[in-house]
Regions:
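A short acidic (Asp/Glu
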Residues: 59-60, 91
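STAS-like cytosolic regulatory interaction modules
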Residues: 1-47, 51-54, 71-120
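Charged helix-capping and loop-helix junction motifs
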Residues: 31-34, 62-66
């Protein structure tokens, strides 16, 4: 049985990408490619990455930080929502400060609403 790694939807003009599973170290490149392709396809829409509990791990944090750098280069707003306080702290501490700020939320609804408001 194949596990769904991620899904996406458009919510009020915000691209919402939900990462359901941790791909592990070996799956990082695939996850990065899939998210990057979505970001480029929906550009200039703001992006919210939601990390389901099983996905809130080191490999996914690394991917999100790389996606943040891509979004900064593209001028696209990126927000992340995760219930995991350690993951939120890791994202905030390691985010690239040279480009667009990475916005990290504890709740998905808050992240989408804030991204929608910022893009309006």
């Amino acid at each position: 049985m194949q596990t769904v790694l991620l899904s996406h939807s458009l919510d009020h003009g915000v691209l919402v990408i939900t990462v359901h599973q941790d791909p592990g170290i070996g799956g990082r490149a695939t996850l990065l490619m899939r998210i990057s392709d979505l970001v480029r396809a929906y550009r200039p829409e703001p992006v919210v990455v939601l990390l389901d509990e099983p996905a809130a791990r080191g490999a996914v944090v690394s991917v999100v930080l790389r996606v943040h750098r891509l979004c900064s280069r593209l001028g696209t707003l990126l927000s992340v929502a995760t219930h995991s306080a350690p993951v939120r702290r890791a994202l905030e501490a390691n985010a690239d400060t040279a480009g667009t700020r990475l916005v990290v939320h504890a709740r998905a609804d808050t992240a989408v609403a804030a991204a929608f408001a910022a893009a309006a």
